[in-house]
């Protein structure tokens, strides 16, 4: 498949699973995804009245956390390429600004935000490095990047157990909860072949982010990565 075709198929897949997406996330993470998103929002270091961008926002679960931190006087934008996801987000949280767009070509001026975040969306981009570069472009100097993402299975017993979960359990559970086993098989494959923590940090640094740090969560299967817009 060509990259363009690939992107269209991924978009169609997220449109299909949108109605059951939040429920599936909760079930598949054993309820931990909510606390991960709270930690990600805290790491964005936002202040009341600030401006936050959530890239690949889905139905807006992290976006809402950002909104709580900037308050009524701030600006919160959620961007996604799935119109179905955005329809659900807009219906649930109409006070937030929802934008359909491409994470690798953000429709915002330079230095528009105090922080940019993305939760479990970076690995679905056709060009993750360009996505991080674009996030750097739209964040003001001194602002923050926060990436919440699954990592390639680590070594040892935990890694083997995690790999079995990805290959065998996740597609079946996803099919049961969201009604689309093929979609969750794709998501399982993207995790199994994704970067490790060191590679993720290197990618962020190469995209213009400084002071990059990674906090492993859930026995090293999830990364909370942060960076600062320097230079």
Per-region residue spans from a language model:
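N-terminal, positively charged/glycine-rich alpha-helical extensions of SAM-dependent methyltransferases
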Residues: 1-20, 166
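C-terminal alpha-helical "lid/dimerization" subdomain adjacent to the S-adenosyl-L-methionine
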Residues: 8, 148-203, 213
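Conserved alpha-helix/loop element of class I SAM-dependent methyltransferases that forms part
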Residues: 30-49, 65
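Class I SAM-dependent methyltransferase SAM/SAH-binding core
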Residues: 51-105
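A short acidic, Gly/Pro-enriched loop at the edge of an enzyme's catalytic core
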Residues: 104-115
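A short SAM/SAH-binding and catalytic strip from SAM-dependent methyltransferases
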Residues: 114-128
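A short glycine-rich, Lys/Arg-flanked "PGG" loop and its adjoining helix->strand segment in the class I
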Residues: 129-144
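Core SAM-dependent methyltransferase catalytic element
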Residues: 208-231
């Amino acid at each position: 498949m060509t990259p363009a075709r690939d992107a269209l198929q991924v978009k169609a897949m997220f449109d299909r699973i949108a109605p059951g997406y939040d429920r599936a996330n909760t079930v598949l993470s054993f309820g931990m995804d909510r606390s991960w998103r709270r930690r990600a929002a805290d790491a964005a270091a936002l202040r009341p009245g600030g401006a936050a961008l959530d890239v690949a926002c889905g139905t807006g679960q992290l976006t809402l956390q950002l909104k709580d931190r900037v308050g009524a006087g701030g600006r919160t934008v959620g961007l996604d390429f799935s119109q179905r996801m955005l329809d659900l987000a807009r219906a649930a949280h109409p006070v937030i600004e929802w934008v359909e767009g491409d994470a690798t070509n953000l429709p915002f001026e330079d230095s528009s935000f105090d922080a940019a975040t993305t939760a479990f969306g970076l690995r679905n981009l056709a060009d993750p490095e360009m996505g991080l570069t674009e996030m750097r472009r739209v964040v003001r100097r001194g602002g923050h990047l926060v990436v919440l993402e699954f990592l390639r299975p680590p070594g040892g017993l935990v890694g083997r157990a995690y790999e079995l979960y990805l290959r065998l359990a996740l597609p079946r559970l996803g099919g049961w909860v969201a009604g689309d086993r093929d979609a969750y098989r794709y998501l399982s494959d993207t995790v199994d072949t994704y970067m490790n923590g060191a590679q993720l940090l290197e990618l962020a640094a190469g995209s213009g982010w400084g002071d990059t740090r990674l906090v492993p969560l859930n026995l090293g299967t999830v990364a909370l990565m942060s960076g600062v817009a320097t230079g």
